[in-house]
From Swiss-Prot:
InterPro entries: Ribosomal_bL35m. It is found in: Mitochondrion. This is Large ribosomal subunit protein bL35m. It comes from the Eukaryota. Keywords: Mitochondrion, Ribonucleoprotein, Ribosomal protein, Transit peptide. PANTHER family: 39S RIBOSOMAL PROTEIN L35, MITOCHONDRIAL, LARGE RIBOSOMAL SUBUNIT PROTEIN BL35M. Belongs to the bacterial ribosomal protein bL35 family. Its main location: mitochondrion. GO terms for cellular component: mitochondrion; ribonucleoprotein complex; ribosome. The keyword rRNA-binding does not apply.
Length: 158
């Protein structure tokens, strides 16, 4: 049994409620770091934050906008203002993590009319093959049975 003094000290030690910051780029909730599973449908759900912040190209690479591109633009120099509007590519490890957070629907190539990213869907001047996270070879275009010198002479990606 607690006495009146002990009870009053317990009540007095109550603290003010914690104020939570508004959700921004740095404030990603903990449930977005792992793969979520939908019990009603019986399969995993795509992370909505990934869909909002990143774009998956048809060749498997992920791009995202430059962080802080709209913050205090008037204070930055001209070069920063120009380059901050560019998109950045993710690293191989980041691409693998983002692929695991997505469902197969979002991993399929998408073809939209008047797509501003259509120029970036094909990788140019890359001789190494694209390999997925299991080490399997992923083709970007149909297989053509001819040697590399002939294909470089007569076929271009543009």
């Amino acid at each position: 049994m607690l006495g009146k003094t002990a009870l009053s000290t317990l009540c007095a030690s109550r603290q003010a409620p914690i104020t939570l910051a508004a959700r921004g780029i740095a404030n990603i909730p903990a449930h977005e770091y792992h793969i979520r599973f939908d019990q009603k449908v019986g399969r995993k759900r795509p992370a909505q934050d990934v869909l909002d912040r990143f774009k998956r190209l048809n060749n498997g690479m992920w791009i995202h906008a430059h962080p802080g591109r709209h913050k205090l633009r008037y204070m930055k120099d001209e070069t920063w203002q120009k380059t901050s509007l560019y998109y950045e590519t993710c690293t191989k490890e980041q691409c693998e993590i983002l692929d695991k957070l997505m469902t197969p629907y979002w991993l399929r190539p998408k073809h939209y009319p008047n797509d501003p990213y259509s120029a970036y869907n094909v990788r140019h001047n890359v001789t190494s093959p694209r390999v997925d996270d299991r080490g399997n070879f992923v083709r970007e275009r149909k297989k053509v049975l001819m040697d590399d010198s002939t294909s470089k002479r007569f076929f271009k990606d543009c």
